[in-house]
Amino acid sequence: LLGDMRMIKSPEEIVVMKQAGEIAGAMMQAAEDALGEGRPEYEAALAVINAGTRKAAGFLTDKGWKAFISPMIHNLQIMQSGTDTSMVHRRASVKPLAKGDPVYFCFCNMAQFKQYKLGFDRMFFIKELSDEAAEVQQTAIDAQQEAIAAMRPGVTAGSVAEAANDVYREPG
């Protein structure tokens, strides 16, 4: 029952959801802007927190009960780069970024505002994208599209996964 009720959003909730989206966008842009050859990973994580907090503060007031809503964006940034990109849920470190490094950000545990949480990930590359990295990214996109196309009522999760896995197997 509660799940069904939560599917219907009030105009106020829709405004908050849009604000949360703007905050998430500011966080993602700050992450990209902070990346650079030789810069440590944690600098990008700090930029994400600062940008999200500043954007959230712009939607708040110091009047009435709403004065008690904190703009603070916090948590440990999930971030992997270079040869550590496959280390799922690794946190930002002092490791310097190198030219050509893939840099993966997961904002799922950080992008939240007024109890609305947004889950999204982004991948960036330092200065350049190798042909091999571009092929890997395109394969992932193609597999995702096949999985989406396979989704329909009554289809098992296993068959959806198999549709994606077929795409992954093609290049070898």
Which sequence ranges carry the predicted segments?
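Active-site neighborhoods and metal-handling regions in enzymes and metal-associated proteins
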Residues: 1-172
